[in-house]
């Protein structure tokens, strides 16, 4: 699973999710991609689940690029714990995703199979997303 090797600070603030993605909005490496249509925190488990769904569908024929990385820790306090006494311990690593961001890219010769694989991956993600192609960039 994707987690940072080393971080300067173990716990971070959680800013409001607002605005649209300024970079990473076009398909750069592959022929098809998954583009986010809303804000979300996507966990490392969700990213891994979507990657496995794509790879199982395309078998050995194509190549997958993951364009997001879970670099932000989310904390949680234990159940039945009283308020106060500091911030909870880090539980998950998440990627902050804004609308317009291309999350995954796929290079595959057959368009129908590629779209089916990306549709399966979209079902694993907690956001609304769409499939974009390299031709739509220009």
Swiss-Prot record:
Keywords: Ribonucleoprotein, Ribosomal protein, RNA-binding, rRNA-binding, tRNA-binding. It comes from the Bacteria. Signal peptide: none annotated. Pfam families: Ribosomal_L16. Residues 1-17 have a biased composition (Basic residues). CDD domains: Ribosomal_L16_L10e. InterPro entries: Ribosomal_uL16, Ribosomal_uL16_bact-type, Ribosomal_uL16_CS, Ribosomal_uL16_dom, Ribosomal_uL16_sf. GO terms for biological process: translation. GO terms for molecular function: rRNA binding; structural constituent of ribosome; tRNA binding. Residues 1-23 are annotated as: Disordered. GO terms for cellular component: cytosolic large ribosomal subunit. Part of the 50S ribosomal subunit. Binds 23S rRNA and is also seen to make contacts with the A and possibly P site tRNAs. HAMAP family: Ribosomal_uL16. Belongs to the universal ribosomal protein uL16 family. This is Large ribosomal subunit protein uL16. The lineage of its organism: Bacteria, Bacillati, Actinomycetota, Actinomycetes, Mycobacteriales. The gene is rplP.
């Amino acid at each position: 699973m994707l987690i940072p090797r080393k971080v300067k600070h173990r716990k971070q603030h959680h800013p409001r999710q607002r605005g649209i993605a300024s970079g990473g909005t076009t398909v750069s490496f592959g022929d098809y991609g998954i583009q986010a249509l809303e804000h979300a925190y996507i966990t490392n488990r969700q990213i891994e689940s979507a990657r496995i769904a794509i790879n199982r569908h395309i078998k050995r024929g194509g190549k997958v690029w993951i364009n997001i990385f879970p670099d932000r820790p989310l904390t949680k306090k234990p159940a039945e714990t009283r308020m106060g006494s500091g911030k909870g311990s880090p539980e998950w690593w998440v990627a902050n995703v804004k609308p317009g961001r291309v999350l995954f890219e796929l290079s595959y010769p057959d368009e129908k199979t590629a779209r089916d694989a990306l549709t399966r991956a979209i079902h694993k993600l907690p956001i609304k997303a769409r499939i974009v192609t390299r031709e739509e960039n220009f």
